[in-house]
Amino acid sequence: MTKHPPNRRGISFEVGAQLEARDRLKNWYPAHIEDIDYEEGKVLIHFKRWNHRYDEWFCWDSPYLRPLEKIQLRKEGLHEEDGSSEFQINEQVLACWSDCRFYPAKVTAVNKDGTYTVKFYDGVVQTVKHIHVKAFSKDQNIVGNARPKETDHKSLSSSPDKREKFKEQRKATVNVKKDKEDKPLKTEKRPKQPDKEGKLICSEKGKVSEKSLPKNEKEDKENISENDREYSGDAQVDKKPENDIVKSPQENLREPKRKRGRPPSIAPTAVDSNSQTLQPITLELRRRKISKGCEVPLKRPRLDKNSSQEKSKNYSENTDKDLSRRRSSRLSTNGTHEILDPDLVVSDLVDTDPLQDTLSSTKESEEGQLKSALEAGQVSSALTCHSFGDGSGAAGLELNCPSMGENTMKTEPTSPLVELQEISTVEVTNTFKKTDDFGSSNAPAVDLDHKFRCKVVDCLKFFRKAKLLHYHMKYFHGMEKSLEPEESPGKRHVQTRGPSASDKPSQETLTRKRVSASSPTTKDKEKNKEKKFKEFVRVKPKKKKKKKKKTKPECPCSEEISDTSQEPSPPKAFAVTRCGSSHKPGVHMSPQLHGPESGHHKGKVKALEEDNLSESSSESFLWSDDEYGQDVDVTTNPDEELDGDDRYDFEVVRCICEVQEENDFMIQCEECQCWQHGVCMGLLEENVPEKYTCYVCQDPPGQRPGFKYWYDKEWLSRGHMHGLAFLEENYSHQNAKKIVATHQLLGDVQRVIEVLHGLQLKMSILQSREHPDLPLWCQPWKQHSGEGRSHFRNIPVTDTRSKEEAPSYRTLNGAVEKPRPLALPLPRSVEESYITSEHCYQKPRAYYPAVEQKLVVETRGSALDDAVNPLHENGDDSLSPRLGWPLDQDRSKGDSDPKPGSPKVKEYVSKKALPEEAPARKLLDRGGEGLLSSQHQWQFNLLTHVESLQDEVTHRMDSIEKELDVLESWLDYTGELEPPEPLARLPQLKHCIKQLLMDLGKVQQIALCCST
């Protein structure tokens, strides 16, 4: 009896109709109807991109079938009721971004379905629903913690009333600040108190302005976006050279307040010390900030690119756009909290005497030691000038240089202009502050062995290594990136260029800052400005290179000189960052300093010798996106400064882990200049070899010469090729997925061919018992790998191996089966690299081109069973099918093929093999020849390995079939359920290939003409 299909909205019951169906795992997939059974009332559903063996019959009224697009029952009625759209084209609105926050945008189109096409303030165009668009209000806070910039200044009105209102608000703000200006002078005469009082002082100073100022500032910043056109041509332009040096610290102090949710006393505190010059500075700063853009979450790379471009216009043209883009992956630990706690910087600089008054009795005794150290330093300044990265020891002694000694114990309050200059200089030069931002300063001296402390409030954990702190922060506190661990002295002196890069709160270093900032001449301002820009454009501190370990101990006093001169030339910066910790003669007399705000001890001098190499074991995970978005001053590594910005485009990470990520300790090959993760290569900071070449440059056997340059073939891994400029559409960009999928498929086929070649060589050994390589199989395969090869499925050595002195093994590409002594196995450290690695992720399954030649076949099958038939005649026919090892167990251990040498497999062999070998054993016993018995065991071991490889080849062939299904689903056939006949398209294909060859010939001729 023929049934009629039901009338289901959105589903047409005909062959080829598109719909969605739910499989037995309760997942919904796009599918189409393959067949219809009108007798049973069922439809055969084919899930797209799945094999036809997964086709399933559904009743046509099944709830597990649904239309592709969800039915919008009320959409039409709602639109008819609405009538006109709420917003018009070119209207300024607030549109919801993917982070569920509203950002300024402009309506570019009103769609018929009730959606709006909007262009966000940073240029991103997106279609949003009407419920995600609301009216733009200039007086409201757009986002709680992230107030974006407003780029569409033309659409904002600038009425005279608002300008007058803005001026009145600004005058009121300045009056409040002037009332608070004398507060530091009054508090300087307070008696000595615990360090927590320093924080109270800082908060008291900004208490009044804390309530009134931030609101005014927010309104000012919103209003100034309307008036920046008028003010850009006013007197503020004339004062720009004078105030340029002040703008950046102000800017840095304000941005984190909103971005990180800092207390609102941060900006008022900074404003207190700058009150005299605030009025002209504020407008100029805000005008510049709006043109540069306040950072907004999730769009930070785009804004950073804009900020770097603006700075390039002001200073020089050599900044690359992708510096900002690659900045987050390159920046390391140093300087993570330079901007995070600006209130600490302000409290240190504004309260000169309170800074000293709040020092504990421990600090007094340390000052006495410093005075004696000062007298000794007058005799020999070179002896006591140390790199600033040396922790408190260096900080306590570096004051003794003659150039700095004159103002060592300076405690008199400075003028607001000088204090303003100090703030700017500290923000420009003190690029990395390594203070502990949380904690009290009256804590006892910490054990010198503990170098890394958890920065979470109320957590008192200390760690000896950066990676331990990293794990603690990630798994105990649930923070992906830790706040800022204290770094080893070696790391400090390598990564530091600022005057107090390690001891910002200490009084001595503060005095040094004052010396360099006490003469606010135009020349110094220009130098500071120039240096700030130079540090900004070099935003990519490189991971440690092996060479640094040998050349670090150079000219310990050069940083002192560079700090006072503020010259931004690359050689000087190189000298600054290369100051070595081994030249610190007065380490024993350097006191442990307490900063009034931190209270943690910076100098871990005792462990200096053992840690001067551990410079980057925790570099990458400390730069969060919030710091990345800010306009911070960062320095760069000396190797990078010498080489210039040209190096940025040519630095390549090529590691066996296949992860294009720069983190932790990295080492660079001296030949190919590629970087590898130290932990992946089994190298730590302590055991860096004198001469290092990567595994690729060592020309391992079986590797093609072009393998060294695989990383340059992005068109293979990403599918993007360079096209001709005059073409509007690039073919590779349109078909990138197809190119990549095809390349992966070819790579898998090539790997299977290589493994099959190795299997043929092994089976040639199995053909005769007199083969010279047969004794190499006296032990089962993988006898070696019981302990150390737990992740060895990803390491090249994949073929025959035994316990003898000269076992055979398959070469890197699996194609050569020439037995050789196992003299060059991969190091144990390499094998265990992902056990002890700091990478907190599982290694991705990468396709070709992979760095290491892993075995690409994984499970059972019988692709080459016919070739093994001669062996089945020898009595092994009962063994071969039954000794397919339980590969799932082995795979759970991380190995690609079974390990008959492991204890479980041995037990398995003893239980399984020996009873079933009974017929052959009887024959051998009759002959009484021990040689035949041993030969049979050798063949048995080899046969076991061959069968496991055959199984894996079959499994890989199944996966290749799936890949082919995916590629076939991308064919541009029209309407049919099956792809067109390939032979029908053969003439067209030939013609295309001929045309392509002709075009390539022309391109070759053009290239020859151009080269000659």
Curated annotation (Swiss-Prot):
Region (Disordered): 142-336, 481-611, 866-912
Signal peptide positions (record): none
Residue numbers bearing the Phosphoserine modification: 159, 488, 878, 880
Family annotation (Pfam families): PHD_5 (PF20826), PHF20_AT-hook (PF12618), Tudor_3 (PF18115)
Main location: nucleus
Modification comment: Ubiquitinated by TRIM26; leading to proteasomal degradation.
Record PTM N6-acetyllysine, positions in chain: 843
Zinc finger extent (PHD-type): 654-700
PROSITE patterns on file: ZF_PHD_1, ZINC_FINGER_C2H2_1, ZINC_FINGER_C2H2_2
One Gene Ontology molecular-function label: zinc ion binding
Domain of life: Eukaryota
DNA-binding residues: 257-269
Gene3D superfamilies recorded: 2.30.30.140, Zinc/RING finger domain, C3HC4 (zinc finger) (3.30.40.10)
Biased composition (Polar residues): 271-280, 497-509
TM helices/strands, residue ranges: none
Keywords: Acetylation, Chromatin regulator, Disulfide bond, DNA-binding, Metal-binding, Nucleus, Phosphoprotein, Repeat, Transcription, Transcription regulation, Ubl conjugation, Zinc, Zinc-finger
Domain Tudor: 4-69, 83-147
GO biological process: chromatin organization; positive regulation of DNA-templated transcription; regulation of transcription by RNA polymerase II
Zinc finger residue extent: C2H2-type: 452-477
Comp. bias (Basic and acidic residues): 147-245, 297-325, 481-490, 522-538, 888-912
Domains: entry comment: The Tudor domain 2 mediates reading of dimethyl-lysine residues.
Subunit structure: Homodimer; disulfide-linked. Component of some MLL1/MLL complex, at least composed of the core components KMT2A/MLL1, ASH2L, HCFC1, WDR5 and RBBP5, as well as the facultative components BACC1, CHD8, E2F6, HSP70, INO80C, KANSL1, LAS1L, MAX, MCRS1, MGA, KAT8/MOF, PELP1, PHF20, PRP31, RING2, RUVB1/TIP49A, RUVB2/TIP49B, SENP3, TAF1, TAF4, TAF6, TAF7, TAF9 and TEX10. Component of the NSL complex at least composed of MOF/KAT8, KANSL1, KANSL2, KANSL3, MCRS1, PHF20, OGT1/OGT, WDR5 and HCFC1.
Function comment: Methyllysine-binding protein, component of the MOF histone acetyltransferase protein complex. Not required for maintaining the global histone H4 'Lys-16' acetylation (H4K16ac) levels or locus specific histone acetylation, but instead works downstream in transcriptional regulation of MOF target genes. As part of the NSL complex it may be involved in acetylation of nucleosomal histone H4 on several lysine residues. Contributes to methyllysine-dependent p53/TP53 stabilization and up-regulation after DNA damage.
Note: Antibodies against PHF20 are present in sera from patients with hepatocellular carcinoma, glioblastoma and childhood medulloblastula.
Entry protein name: PHD finger protein 20
Organism of origin: Homo sapiens
Source organism phylogeny: Eukaryota, Metazoa, Chordata, Craniata, Vertebrata
Underlying gene: PHF20
